[in-house]
């Protein structure tokens, strides 16, 4: 990619919508990616000339020459409505809405529920004892003749394994990058790292090849990464020990015992539940106060107070990828890192599932070594005292829970088994009904006391890992409570003031500018985010202006030397949005969610400070890179190819929403806008914008070959599953 002239994205914030004056190819020739700043003219709707249509709210303003009059595409409003559950699912796709629980409400009949992805397996598998050994010197199979897998390598390759893929130039991308393929003869591109050699008895033996030079270049860049370049890998022995309750959580046990005693004492002291209805005598009150003091004395300080934890930093130059369920998988995060994303998070993991040792939940903690590197920050960044960039990471974990002990014990296990985490974030924003009904996610917004207990306990057991929290404006549209909640998160609630135990010690707060009720039906409320940013700034700089000296936090209990970072989240879709939020909302950084799924190069735009009109060829190369990362993560055997195809299709169900900016009449683009039927500047661009899931499968086959006969894919929405019409 040719170099881009770097422009400080914080210098100018456009105040008006702009008419897109970019030159656009009107024929079918490929439109090159624009690396120069798109020339734009500030106008108002009244100043529109030359018959250009006015911008209609909710509809992408596509230039007339790219509009298609008749198409099987869904209309903008319909497509917008049906895409809402997909956006919700990006926050918690593992917890689908339960049927029959929506009493008095209209069912979302456009959704495909209980989707089946079929299977992608060999007709008969190759025995593991043969998968990596030379043909004539295999390892011993412990099952012998009773083994249900194939033992003859040539028979397996000829009869049970599908033919090799011809994509990627016929070369296995894992072997090409690392000099060895961990899938041996089962690899769908095994021909690139397999050969025959002559033996002393005149036979020809199949063997696997390794490239020492490639292996040397592929050595991990961080010392604690695995041979495959992964960090935070939890061994099977550790997961089994957790599942069988053989792994103890001593810090959590001590803290939870103290919390239980403290809660009972506070309940008596604050609510007088130990008193009879006739009133209370002074002796009883004094006894209760003595009990509170006794609990204070019994409290054992955690090994690391918040002020003793690793310092972190968020700034304008650190755009952050939001935690995304399903979409936020490891290959996608790697892709975003390549485009300039500075911080990533795991998919949301349920605390109880981690405590139970569920393999699928612990697998979410795996990160690529590129996520274990320090973030790139400005040399003039206003970092907090004690911040050491060389000890910082890009990857953090997000967990959810409905009880304090779930979150606290899960945090202690994470800090012990996956120490290479930047932060552990508590999800208080997930809107999915099942998560909400269980009391987790956004349900915690209505229970601030419980939330504070969870965060305080997480801080007590997380060792050096800072604790952060992600919230919404509230659970209902007409009653936002984020300002009150933020004050509690920074200063501590009334109970903490009585016990004189300081604030809960969160290092950062992220606010999604929507309520739980709102979901994605309206634009994020950045004016409210700005109000909360101003509040946090006041709390950080002038705590004595908003509280009395009795509630002034103990300096020992403050994370980051007393600074709580604040991130805004919602509808960031371009460098224009990012700059506007940094300059006008006053947030430290912006967390990008759907905007990054639809166009991962939004991080590159933020870094360059300009729109980038990616050509269809460049976007296809991006999808190819995702395919390579997918095979590296899930495997290059039949099962791994099928898994990569499934997650690529899930991703393409978002990327098709992208309308190239060269086709737009006005800038900036809005993430909520849905386009009328349109055609691209060439056939490939049109294909990439197709809402038909069969076209998405066609795109995956460009890199992963024809789908397995048993593979299935049902799009999230029935509106995407139509037959092409002539």
UniProtKB/Swiss-Prot annotation:
A single BP term in Gene Ontology: mRNA processing
Family from the record: Belongs to the Dus family. Dus3 subfamily.
Flavoprotein in keyword set: yes
Name used for this protein in its record: tRNA-dihydrouridine(47) synthase [NAD(P)(+)]
Organism: Aspergillus fumigatus (strain ATCC MYA-4609 / CBS 101355 / FGSC A1100 / Af293)
Compositionally biased region (Basic and acidic residues): 28-38, 94-103, 113-124
Keywords associated with the record: Cytoplasm, Flavoprotein, FMN, Metal-binding, mRNA processing, NAD, NADP, Nucleus, Oxidoreductase, Repeat, tRNA processing, Zinc, Zinc-finger
Keyword Membrane: no
SUPFAM superfamilies linked: FMN-linked oxidoreductases
Binding site for FMN: 323-325, 398, 470, 512, 569-571, 593-594
